[in-house]
Amino acid sequence: MSGDDSEMGRGVQGSVEADFPLKELYLSSHNSTLTDSSLFVPRDRPGTSDIPVMKSWLPYQELSISKHVKTLVKLQPASPLDMEGRRVTRRTLSPGPRVGAVAALLGCWLLVIPTLCSGQTFTSFHPERREWAFNHLTVHQTTGALYIGAVNRVYKLSGNLTLLVSHDTGPEDDNKACYPPLIVQPCSEPLVSTNNVNKLLLIDYSQNRLLACGSLYQGVCKLLRLDDLFILVEPSHKKEHYLSSVNQTGTMYGVIVPSLGQDGTLFIGTAVDGKQDYFPTISSRKLPRDPESSAMLDYELHTDFVSSLIKIPSDTLALVSHFDIYYVYGFASGSFVYFLTVQPETPENSMSSGGSTSDLFYTSRIVRLCKDDRKFHSYVSLPVGCVKNGVEYRLLQAAYLGKPGRVLAASLGISAQDDVLFTVFSKGQKQFHRPPDDSALCVFTIRDINARIKERLQSCYQGEGHLELNWLLGKDVQCTKAPVPIDDSFCGLDINQPLGGSQLVTGHTLYTETRDRMTSVTSYVYNGYCVAFVGTKSGRLKKIRVDGPPHGGVQYETISVIKDGSPVLRDMAFSLDRNYLYVMSERQ
């Protein structure tokens, strides 16, 4: 279904089995009290006497934060008929029962949704400075606390967005040319006050700590105690501790793989901005249980001949001057870790081109590694995208790993407990840094992705074709024939690796939008139905029921959630009780 065709109205991170799809929207005005120089919180929860009720598709009440925060509303269950595709009609009802709040982290001043909550009063939360934008958010799956990574700050908030703790990460005097960084040894370069952009925010549940990585000092990380954001350790004395000095958010992604009773592993992918000698583009690192361990963030394996990392060769950067790999999303499923990336194409006939970024063609790819593979022999990378009516969507914007629910699973030929990957792509393969508004919501099954990777491995081990990883190998390398059985858990050998491919892994296109580029996606399951929530370039939220092939998806409605039209960012998360939603945006 297309965004242009829908007459159902125009239209958030975690797939959850919701108790009900929320439909009734309660709005409330209430007083607030100043508890901090930058934080306003409500004195009381809304009662029932002052709650006018409006019907809406919006499945979650909303609360926002990003330079500021707004608190809002809650919704009652929708009827089964509404889940079958009927449009929900707005009308005023009598006040409903006492309700809580739903939240969205949004980047605007005292945000008001004109169509739903005109005249309402909202609480607000904002950083010390307007330019210190929010970058990442995550919700603790046991306590429900929110952790927000921002420019120069890490915040811990309660579920209703009350500020609990703030940890300073910048600004500090620095210079990107200082290597090793200033905190290790003096630097002769001129130093200037430099902001610290949060690029990675991960909860290490097994050790009750938060990993926060920024752009300062060549990309140093901190391990913070979850309770009070106290610094447990800030590793910085080895070159392995510098992840990347790129100060752009959305270019790095990490996945923590815990190990019961043992040290965990951090898989991390990052853009390197031409500093391939300093930073690997992808690596796996140690996460010792002891924060003071000298092995903290060391590579899992590092010898002269084999290592748990891959670097972009200098020859590639010499031939394709703007080459880099941007890591959009990552996750673990089964025995594997996956990353979704966007990178310039480097076919054989273009490796001698050093054109501008506007001349480059970009490819979105899925990268798979075995969780226990310290040698990276299991590295496989295949292109991914969607096609609708002959139009290719190849520029990845966002992704989310979720569950399909009974209805979508049946249409995809999988179990309701299988993993599915929701993705948003923009049209074409050019202008990655300024993607087209024409975009598509698609779904892949992890089972299909693994099957395509298995086929690629089997073909190569039969001696067919080449490794097809020109950006890394610099040339076409013939696959080596070897009588090796390739099963579903195959993790590679010291031949035929690392392995690429050129055959597109195509997802199922669910929904397209030609004018308001989709920028984020999440999902939840109710009564067997899968519902996707999609943020857009203009600060809107879409609700889409996902039926899968051949019907695609049905958009119910769209609501404007950001007054100044700032894009909704990738990070979205449900609250612990699954009745709340947090959506983030920054002032562009």
Language-model-detected regions and their locations in the chain:
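Beta-strand-rich domains and repeat architectures in extracellular enzymes and scaffolds
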Residues: 122-153, 195-200, 248-253, 324-329, ...
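Intrinsically disordered, low-complexity basic segments at termini and long loops, enriched
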Residues: 1-83
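Beta-propeller fold recognition
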Residues: 164-188, 199, 203-208, 214-322, ...
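N-terminal signal peptide
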Residues: 57, 72, 84-86, 96-128
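Surface-exposed extracellular loop regions of Gram-negative outer-membrane beta-barrel proteins
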Residues: 322-340
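Residue-level signal for tight coil/turn positions that link beta-strands
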Residues: 55, 141-143, 151, 205-207, ...
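Double-stranded DNA-binding cores of transcription factors and transposases
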Residues: 137, 157-169
